[in-house]
């Protein structure tokens, strides 16, 4: 009997040993940067215009939403559906009436650009196309920059045509009103048309026949970006995305005059009521939509700063609802279409830095700050519409003493932008350098891997050099601006060519190199081989141990911290595999611990879409780009 019990215990022990690699240590799935976490409840991506129905139903337009229609519908602080395809709309203008929604359409081979689509609010299908502009070949910029309805009439700003076009809501042209650079529109109770000229800081009034009437001349720095006529008060509300970052209200019963403002003067850049860059109630960024419902609730659509030529990735969705007293009632917020936020070592992983925004918390978290200051730093590359990237929304972060270095990049970048922070500028990321660029004395693109390590050093695989270049951080000046020394090259080990990813962990002097796909010209993809070099700076640049063999298909993004390498995949599974850097073994696969509350998306379709940090408690925090749900997935894992 004793022998039998011993044998049973032995067998049980062997079984435990066999299955141990497949057992999962405890982990949780969470999310940031979206008010809601599931695919059916989430807030839509990058709303750039808004119309509010009298009953309080909100319609927003976006150029792109991966998992729903580009016109999102909300009521009472929740998503209630969407209209159209995910790439059907331009996003820059929307309006409606009791039966229909009118919105600018994205360029299409069938009808080009400059077209408005009419959609039934009940049927949620398109029933009319209205060709507004002679500019039909524009594939990027907004051609139609304003829409409004009044009674049986539809008004449309044809920006390149320098005119406001008037149609019936059935699409029959009535007349044109000549206006240079027309933008947002509103129609008052008498049928007068108000037209914003954003770059000029003016709002023009025309009578119903198109004859000029009054002009509201705002300050030279003002940029009227949204208009709304309040029939109850007979007042015109104008969103200003200039330095004031607020909403201005004008009495238009006679000669227009400014009667009040709504929102903190300076918006998110104000330093008297908060930290510069801090968003929140009445701390507006770009006000791109204003509306009221029949009970007097005010709705404000912000479009946080940050975006290049791809207007589907320009800012994010940020809707505020305010009661009649002016108090905030709720917010609906989402990440830019695609991006990731890196855990901040300076707060032991409590804060997360994206390419343009900062977040904290859990279960959607809190949108803390927009780090782009378009007023003081208009040349910030995150605002450059001619940038090669489609938006610099992927953040990498190093905390060195009291200083932080932020690196922003795109979905599949071969150039990177560097920023610093200081007390005077609060949460604003101050532009410093570009790689490639003068600060690093190179014009070579980064096609063979990039890493900002935890010491602030930079490691880069410069295209065509057959080397891994190390730029050591030499220090910070009095303003917090970092500088780096001359690059020192190390030949790429022959066993890992073509090299595609670099990660260096200075705490353990460990270099991690990932191979691309042998024989392929796609420098953005990862193959199956990852080499781990312990003691790299101590001289071991030739002997990898372990060598990790990735057996799952299509690895795309990797990140590492502590004792683990984390791997995400594209076009296959949303899983994150955790490989042990000492043994090379696959120790865990993170999938979804809370599928009822968190949607983790399909995959990772970005080169640097994973970030990680090991907290002082030993807990690993891994963040993942979730372009399917306009959010950031957060895994917390303790091996």
Predicted segments, located by residue:
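Surface-exposed loop and turn segments in beta-propeller and other repeat-based domains
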Residues: 28-41, 83-87, 125-139, 217-219, ...
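Beta-strand-rich domains and repeat architectures in extracellular enzymes and scaffolds
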Residues: 38-67
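Repeated scaffold domains used in trafficking and secretory/extracellular systems
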Residues: 46-49, 88-96, 140-148, 181-187, ...
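Conserved beta-propeller blade signature
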Residues: 57-60, 100-103, 154-156, 192-195, ...
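Short glycine/acidic-enriched loop and turn motifs that connect beta-strands
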Residues: 64-68, 107-112, 161-162, 200-201, ...
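Blade-level signature of beta-propeller repeat domains, shared across WD40, Kelch, NHL, RCC1
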Residues: 340-341, 352, 358-361, 602-639
């Amino acid at each position: 009997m004793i022998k039998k019990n011993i044998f049973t215990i032995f067998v049980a022990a062997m079984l435990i040993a066999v299955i141990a690699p497949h057992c999962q240590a405890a982990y949780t799935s969470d999310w940031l940067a979206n008010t809601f976490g599931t695919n059916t409840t989430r807030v839509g991506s990058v709303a750039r215009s808004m119309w509010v129905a009298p009953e309080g139903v909100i319609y927003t337009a976006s150029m792109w939403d991966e998992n729903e229609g580009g016109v999102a519908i909300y009521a009472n602080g929740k998503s209630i559906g969407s209209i159209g395809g995910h790439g059907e709309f331009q996003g820059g203008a929307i309006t409606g009436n009791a039966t229909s929604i009118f919105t600018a359409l994205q360029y299409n081979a069938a009808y080009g650009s400059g077209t408005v689509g009419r959609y039934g609010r009940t049927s949620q299908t398109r029933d009319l196309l209205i060709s507004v502009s002679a500019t039909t070949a524009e594939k990027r910029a907004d051609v139609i920059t304003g829409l409004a309805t009044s009674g049986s009439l539809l008004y449309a700003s044809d920006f390149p045509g320098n005119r406001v076009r008037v149609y019936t809501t059935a699409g029959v042209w009535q007349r044109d009103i000549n206006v240079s650079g027309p933008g947002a529109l509103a129609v008052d109770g008498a049928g007068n048309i108000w037209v914003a000229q954003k770059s000029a800081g003016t709002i023009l009034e025309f009578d119903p026949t198109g004859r000029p009437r009054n002009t509201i001349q705002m300050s030279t720095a003002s940029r009227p970006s949204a208009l709304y006529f309040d029939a109850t008060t007979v007042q015109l509300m104008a969103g200003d995305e200039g330095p004031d970052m607020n909403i201005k209200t004008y009495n238009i019963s006679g000669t227009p005059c400014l009667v009040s403002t709504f929102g903190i003067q300076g918006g998110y850049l104000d330093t008297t009521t908060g930290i510069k860059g801090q968003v929140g109630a009445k701390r507006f960024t770009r006000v791109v939509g204003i509306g009221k419902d029949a009970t007097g609730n005010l709705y404000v659509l912000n479009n946080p700063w940050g975006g290049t030529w791809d207007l589907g990735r320009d800012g994010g969705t940020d809707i505020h609802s305010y009661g009649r007293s002016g108090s905030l009632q709720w917010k609906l917020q989402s990440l830019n279409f695609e991006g990731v936020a890196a855990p901040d070592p300076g707060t032991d992983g409590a804060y997360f830095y994206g390419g343009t925004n900062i977040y904290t918390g859990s279960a959607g978290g809190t949108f803390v700050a927009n780090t782009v200051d378009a007023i003081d730093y208009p040349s910030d590359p995150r605002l450059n519409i001619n940038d090669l990237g489609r938006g610099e929304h992927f953040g990498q972060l190093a905390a060195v003493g009291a200083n932080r270095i932020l690196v922003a990049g795109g979905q599949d970048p071969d150039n990177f932008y560097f920023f610093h922070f200081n007390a005077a500028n609060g949460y604003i990321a101050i532009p410093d350098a570009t790689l490639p660029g003068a600060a690093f004395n190179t014009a070579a693109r980064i096609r063979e891997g990039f890493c900002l390590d935890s010491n602030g050093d930079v490691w880069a695989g410069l295209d065509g050099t057959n080397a891994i270049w190390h730029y050591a951080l030499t220090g910070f000046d009095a303003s917090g601006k970092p500088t780096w020394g001359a690059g020192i090259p190390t030949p790429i080990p022959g066993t890992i060519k073509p090299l595609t990813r670099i990660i260096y962990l200075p705490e353990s002097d460990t270099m991690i190199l990932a191979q691309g796909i042998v024989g392929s010209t796609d420098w953005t993809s990862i193959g199956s081989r990852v080499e781990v070099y312990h003691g790299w700076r101590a001289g071991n640049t030739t002997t990898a141990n372990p060598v990790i063999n990735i057996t799952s298909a299509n690895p795309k993004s990797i990140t590492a911290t502590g004792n683990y390498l984390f791997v995400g995949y594209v076009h296959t599974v949303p899983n994150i595999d955790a490989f042990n850097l000492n043994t090379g073994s696959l120790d865990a696969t993170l999938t979804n611990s809370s599928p009822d509350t968190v949607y983790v998306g399909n995959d990772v379709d970005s080169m640097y879409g994973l970030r990680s940090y090991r907290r002082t408690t030993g807990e690993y925090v891994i963040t993942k780009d979730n372009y399917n749900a306009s959010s950031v997935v957060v895994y917390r894992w303790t091996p």
